[in-house]
Curated annotation (Swiss-Prot):
The keyword Cytoplasm does not apply. The gene is CBP4. The keyword Membrane applies. It is found in: Mitochondrion inner membrane. The chain crosses the membrane at residues 7-29. This is Assembly factor CBP4. It comes from Phaeosphaeria nodorum (strain SN15 / ATCC MYA-4574 / FGSC 10173) (Glume blotch fungus). The lineage of its organism: Eukaryota, Fungi, Dikarya, Ascomycota, Pezizomycotina.
């Protein structure tokens, strides 16, 4: 049977690995600001220009997830239904736009025919 010293060594070694490993990763990993400072000036400008849009997209995504999580259905089913509803709405909007364009085209043709007679 191992001695008490062996148990202490094993426990202390495990503690060093379990606590020290994540601490080392946190210490070595650069922050977002440090990564941003390493960018070239043109990449910094692009990142600053996209930052607001990216933040807005993320806010929209989280808001949508919060709304979908209120339903009784699993979130992936609710997401699929919301996507299909949104695609139907977009398709209807495209059809309406196409119909309006066709009606405008017919109206112009009628005006041209009426003015040429």
């Amino acid at each position: 049977m191992p001695s008490m010293g062996t148990y202490i060594k094993a426990i202390s070694g495990g503690a060093i690995l379990c606590i020290g490993g994540p601490a080392l990763v946190m210490w070595v990993t650069p922050t977002e600001e440090e990564i941003f400072k390493r960018y070239s000036p043109e990449l910094q400008k692009k990142a600053l220009a996209r930052r607001e849009q990216t933040q807005q997209d993320f806010d929209n995504f989280t808001t949508q997830l919060k709304e979908l999580s209120k339903s009784e259905k699993p979130i992936w089913i609710a997401q699929k239904e919301a996507d299909s509803h949104r695609s139907e709405t977009e398709a209807q909007a495209k059809r309406d736009e196409r119909d309006a364009y066709a009606a405008e085209s017919r109206r112009r043709q009628a005006e041209i025919r009426a003015s040429s007679q």
